[in-house]
Each structure stands twice: as structure tokens, then as C-alpha cells.
Amino acid sequence: VRGVHVALAVSASLLLWADRYSDLDLLVADWMFDHASGTFPWRGAWLADRFNHAILKSWLQVLGVATLAVAAWDWWRPRPGWTASRRIGLRVLASAAVLVPTVVSLLKRVSASHCPWDLQRYGGSEPYVRLLEAVPAGVSSGHCMPAGHASGALWLLALAVFWLPHQPRKAAAAGAAMLVFGFTVGWIQQLRGAHFLTHTLWSIWIAVLIVDSLYRYFAPVPLKKL
């Protein structure tokens, strides 16, 4: 558990540095942008636009609602034979299905960052504004960070909790798989020009923080003392 907190602190510092002092986001977006046509080629691609942004999003929303329904039913009428770890896992997963997308959405509302496809650099009309940088006079906030679409998949990180605390390796494998899945969803959005790399990475950071906090909240008392 302490290792997670150290990883969160270190990764937050690295992300803040990358946002403020590096051109990582621009370098990745430049690579994805076709300067000859002046477009992000994947913006209208079926896989990126129709499947990833619409179909997959709907599937994940249905899965989230189903998870909430099962958790609510078990809370109202606890299923006999369910272990404490399974019940904790279900409650963490259901809570994450709500909190991860909600927190990311609320942070987007106060974000100044614009999406790549809105920037002058990529054929749009807005200037590039770094994290914590003041928005130039006359320029509206972009509300594009963190990555909202990725957060719709990143709540599945909570699946790792079903193997805790007795099978940490399986928990780590499940968590890693879901992080890769969430990152892939975010990466495809980046190919469309909808987000920068750090937008997706901040969503991952937030998801890890929320899932860790939920597990500590729902877990048995001995775990909370770690």
C-alpha cells in the first residue's frame, strides 16, 4: 500500500514537470498530426470515432450500470456464501464506476487546457496553454484535461481489488491489464487529436488514487493501518 503512495507522489511530480517544462505533449501530437493535409488522420476513422468513442463508451456505461445494480442488490440483500473480499471488490468496483468518470469530468470543467485539434498549431484557433499557466486575455478555457473518455474505461482498474490482499500478483496483473486498456482507449483519442498524452496520464493517476482510496475505505480495519 505504501508503494502505491510513493508511486503516486513520484508520478505526479514527473507529470507536473512534463506539463510545465517539457514539450512531450507537442512532440507526440506532432507525430500524430499530418502536416501535409492539416488534419489528424484518425479523427474520422471508424475505429477511433465510431467504435472507440461511441460503441465502446456505451458498452462501458452499460457495464458500469450493471455493476452498480449488482452492488446495490447485494447491499440490500447480501448474497449468502460471498466472501468478504468479493464483497469489498464489488463495492470498490461499483464506487469506482461512478467516482473515476465523475472526478475527471469535474476537473475538466476547471481546466484551461485546449484539445490539440483546437490549437493554432494544428489548424485551430486557440493558443497552447501549459498546466497552471494563466490563460491569455480574451481566450476561453479549453476544458480538455484530464482525458474524460479514458476515464470511462479506467474505473475497471478496480477489478484488481478482487484478488487483494491474498493474491497480490494476480491483483497486479489485473490492474496492469486494465491500465493498459484504459491507456489504449486514451491513446486512440490522442490519435484523433482529442487529447494530449499527459491528459490520459493524469486520468490514469486519478483512477489509481481513487481506487486505492476506495480500497482503504472498504477494506478491513487491519489494512487501514498500513
Q: Which sequence ranges carry the predicted segments?
A:
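Membrane-embedded catalytic cores of phosphoryl/pyrophosphoryl-handling enzymes
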Residues: R2-L8, V129-L226
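Aromatic-anchored segments of alpha-helical transmembrane domains
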Residues: S13-W17, V98-V103, L179-Q190
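Membrane-interface loops
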Residues: L27, A84-H166
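Alpha-helical transmembrane spans of integral membrane proteins, capturing the lipid-embedded, hydrophobic core
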Residues: L8-A12, V62-L63, L93, A97-P101, ...
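Cytoplasmic juxtamembrane regions at transmembrane-helix boundaries
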Residues: A69-A94, W163, Q167-A177
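Hydrophobic alpha-helical transmembrane segments
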Residues: L56-D74, H149-V161
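N-terminal transmembrane-helix/juxtamembrane module of multi-pass inner/ER membrane proteins
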Residues: V1-L68, K108-S111, P116, E126
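Alpha-helical membrane-inserting segments
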Residues: L14, A18, D25, L68-A72, ...
